[in-house]
Amino acid sequence: MEQEQNRAPETPPAGAPAELPFGEPLLICPGLYRVRVPLPHNPLQALNSYIVLGDETTTIIDVGFNHPACEKALDKALESLGRTWDTVEIVLTHSHPDHTGNLDRIYRDGMRVYANLHSFKEVENLMQMQANVFGPLLRKAATPQQSGLVFRKGKHRLHISAELLPLTCKPDLIYLHEGDVLRAGSFSFEVIETPGHDPWHICLYEPDRKLMIIGDHVLERITPSVSSWFPAYNALEEFLESLGKMYLYDVDLVLPAHGTPYTGLRERVMFLIAHHGERLQELYDLVAAGHDDIVSISSHAKWRYENWNEWPLDQKFFSMGETMAHLVHLVCEGKIKQTICGDEYRFELP
């Protein structure tokens, strides 16, 4: 197409800026574009939406927060590509609000929405479990200034920020599962279930072009969070098994949800496996040293940022979820044991 021929390739020439403005499509290969969508008030700063052009359809993969800036970016991208919303179908790599929230703004009646979910009710049920388990923990971890923010009145979920509230639109979902082939334009994507970062995470592999749209599963410079929101769910085991799947695919270019496209998928997978091994050992050592509850263990673990007590409440929330995931994995391996004390879970050596 003429629009594609007039656009810059994914790798910019020497001296060019590393990133284009939000909402400006960047050609990856004929028919496939990357669009940076802003994530206001979020350290990730941007989401990569991928747009696939077909003769009559426009497929958008991941859509951003429920925020006007996210809607504006996708509006700009479609206008630039000469497309309109009535041609759009949506594919979600997973349920997190930086990938799904914008549905509340862009969804139109009859729009096809694909996901590894039967219904968004599954996500709401998980949010309720989060509130039940982590509400007391967040109250304990909160500073006096943060304590009033733990719950939003009338909402059965933790109040972290407005962008993280549940979807109000309830589209019927077209269920994608392992081995399905999703056809978009001239592309045929194999669906790969990769739970761990999210129970409903999928990656999309295009074998002819050796491309992997990988969502948040394997990011080049960021370690994806892996959280357990209740102690019976071994999210880390699922994540490590999902990482192992990546060795099965011949991938020349990885298209992540955050950061720029990259190469070297298998090397990055090896790094992540080693990273989680080190984290497991660190948390085992903290339990052995007498730290026995989620808040104490989380606050003494090594994180990228110093002074855990002064962190924003949402960062404490995610750090405790990640701590829980590693502790549950250690319990499943028989290296530590778990007990219940009141409304808290305690951990100790066998």
Task: Give each language-model segment a name.
Residues 2-19, 285-350:
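C-terminal regulatory/interaction regions
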Residues 6-7, 30-37, 159-165, 185-187:
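Short Pro/Gly-enriched beta-strand edge/turn motifs at strand-loop
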Residues 22-85, 203-215, 220:
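Conserved beta-strand hairpin/beta-sheet module of binuclear metal-dependent hydrolase folds
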Residues 31, 258, 283, 330:
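Residue-level signal for inorganic ion chemistry
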Residues 58, 65-68, 158-173, 181, ...:
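Metallo-beta-lactamase
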Residues 66-71, 77-182:
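Active-site HxH/HxHxD metal-binding segment of metal-dependent hydrolases
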Residues 73, 81, 95, 99-100, ...:
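Active-site/pore-lining binding-face segments in mid-to-C-terminal subdomains
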Residues 93-99, 197, 258, 326:
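Histidine-centered divalent metal-coordination motifs
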